[in-house]
């Protein structure tokens, strides 16, 4: 059986943890940041865990993570 291909776009967006979960960046922290509070921007700069309902799709896109 041939090797599975990794979707490079997903590999750049998600990182696997040691327990098999995936981490992602939060949205709304790219531009138009002037009116957002420092507290909100600090929160948006942290990583989030991919929801378990989406984790299976991410796992298919990154088979060797």
From Swiss-Prot:
Keywords: Ribonucleoprotein, Ribosomal protein
Keyword Ribonucleoprotein: yes
GO MF entry, a single one: structural constituent of ribosome
Superkingdom to which the source organism belongs: Bacteria
This protein's name: Large ribosomal subunit protein bL35
Annotated family: Belongs to the bacterial ribosomal protein bL35 family.
Single Gene Ontology BP annotation: translation
InterPro entries: Ribosomal_bL35 (IPR001706), Ribosomal_bL35-like (IPR021137), Ribosomal_bL35_CS (IPR018265), Ribosomal_bL35_sf (IPR037229)
Signal peptide range in chain numbering: none
Name of encoding gene: rpmI
NCBIfam families: rpmI_bact
A Gene Ontology cellular-component term: cytosolic large ribosomal subunit
């Amino acid at each position: 059986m041939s090797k599975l291909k990794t979707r490079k776009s997903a590999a750049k967006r998600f990182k696997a943890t040691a327990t098999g979960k995936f981490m992602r960046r939060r949205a709304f922290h790219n531009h138009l940041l002037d009116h957002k509070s420092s507290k909100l921007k600090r929160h948006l700069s942290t990583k989030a865990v991919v929801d378990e309902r989406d984790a299976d799709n991410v796992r298919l896109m990154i088979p060797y993570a």
